[in-house]
Regions:
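Short, intrinsically disordered, charge-biased short linear motifs at domain edges
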Residues: 17-21, 367-370
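C-terminal cap/substrate-recognition subdomain and adjoining C-terminal extension
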Residues: 29-45, 56-57, 62, 159, ...
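A metal-dependent, Asp-based hydrolase signature
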Residues: 79, 86, 94-208
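Generic secondary-structure boundary signal with a strong preference for alpha-helix termini
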Residues: 82-83, 102, 241, 248
Length: 413
């Protein structure tokens, strides 16, 4: 609200000083494209003022807006929708050893997957008629544990740069080509868009969403930003061929879609390795576009910042103008935005602590547009455990000056 008032006063002053002869309505609309959908509270006005200030309405072009994909631009997770389709259509290749699918796979995870799914390179997993195999894969994807509760992943990793079960999904498709994975994603997209809102399906013993929807408000926001001269990117911790299939639906091409990029073998097939960032080369999931990794890929791929510097917050002119996300995975790059930090409230503690603290007056909080969550009853534990530390611990959320963010009540739902 503080920033909205400031922008409103500035806009009023500009109007008072404007010459009497105004451009035609059509010319004004082309220069100053407007949002056309409804938002919570004053959010539409807040976003519009950022668009006007950074875009063609003020004579500017080239500002960057970046959005997470899953549960930010769409309701529900498109990587999960693709995995669901693959499990029901026997599309996953059978690995020679489950241990080889992840650098962090435990003996317990290997045993559980081997018992439920089998091994032996070549052919496909018969997941459509092996519910125990499907169960193990879905449980590991969702929780990082086997159906018996044993840890599926163990070892050391930077918890602000990766999470093994996110990196594992592209690794499950090792042996397939990007074109094959794209075709699975396209089939899953058709199926998920046709399913009614609220629909679920059963995978093994798991109940999962059966539908996905593009948010009308986000589609309109992206289109308006593009018309106003912004360069709009998607930055996702999903698999890049999957995300590209969906991002085309909001007018964002592959060149502006950043996600986990699997390295291909000499025959053009996906491997268990992925491209790196920030001075870290090809790796087996050590760094992906996840929390601080999203900042790294934005700095590297959009602003051309190479080496370890890509992990660092950049000066004002080398940061995005608008950032949008829904989860702790997005908190770093959304915080970096200079104009608006757009958050869809999914009750994710670290992100919501930053949003409700609103240290710079530029945070824009919106309930999910479809099936929004109810109000969180307890305050977010910002002063104690909301920050996701690199070693996997949970510590207080700190402001740039080192002060602790106090616990925050959930007020936008």
């Amino acid at each position: 609200m503080r920033q909205l008032l400031a922008w409103s006063l500035a806009a009023a002053a500009a109007l008072a000083a404007a010459p009497a002869l105004a451009p035609t309505a059509a010319a004004a609309d082309a220069k100053c494209p407007k949002l056309g959908t409804s938002w919570y509270g004053n959010n539409r006005a807040h976003l519009q003022q950022v668009i006007d200030a950074y875009g063609t309405c003020s004579g500017h072009r080239g500002a960057v807006a970046a959005f997470d994909w899953d549960n930010t631009v769409t309701k529900n997770d498109v990587t999960d929708a693709t995995l669901s389709w693959a499990l029901r259509h026997n599309a996953l290749p059978r690995p020679a050893r489950w241990k080889d699918t992840s650098a962090w796979m435990t003996d317990a995870g290997d045993r559980a997957l081997t018992a439920a799914c089998g091994t032996g390179a070549g052919g496909s997993l018969r997941t459509s008629d092996r519910p125990k195999c499907t169960d193990e894969i879905v449980e590991i994807r969702e929780k990082g544990t086997t159906m018996s509760g044993a840890a599926a992943f163990a070892g050391t990793w930077n918890h602000r740069r990766t999470v093994p079960q996110y990196a594992w999904v592209p690794q499950l498709f090792a042996g397939r080509t990007p074109a094959q994975l794209s075709s699975y994603a396209a089939a899953a997209r058709t199926e998920a868009l046709a399913a009614p809102i609220g629909a679920t399906r059963t995978l093994g013993t798991h109940t999962v969403p059966a539908y996905v929807r593009y948010y009308d408000q986000q589609r309109d926001l992206i289109r308006t930003l593009q018309r106003a001269g912004f360069r709009v990117y998607i930055v996702s911790a999903g698999s890049e061929p999957v995300t590209e299939v969906w991002s085309r639906g909001v007018g964002i091409d592959a060149a502006h879609t950043i996600a986990i990029r699997s390295v291909l073998d000499h025959r053009g097939r996906i491997t268990t390795r992925n491209e790196g960032c920030g001075g870290i080369g090809v790796n087996k999931g050590d760094v992906i576009p996840y929390i601080d990794g999203k900042r790294c890929w934005i700095n590297q791929d959009i602003y051309g910042i190479k080496g370890p510097a890509a992990w660092q917050k950049q000066p004002w002119k080398q940061r995005i103008a608008v950032g949008g996300g829904d989860a702790d995975t997005d908190v770093t790059f959304v915080s970096d935005a200079t104009g608006a930090h757009l958050v869809l409230n999914r009750n994710k503690a670290e992100l919501m602590c930053r949003a409700y603290d609103d240290a710079d007056g530029r945070w824009v909080i919106n309930p999910m547009f479809i099936e929004p969550l109810p109000r969180r009853t307890d305050p977010y534990p910002c002063s104690t455990t909301a920050y996701n530390a690199p070693d996997g611990g949970h510590t207080p959320v700190l402001r740039p000056d080192g002060s602790v963010v106090p616990d925050q009540a959930d007020t936008v739902y």
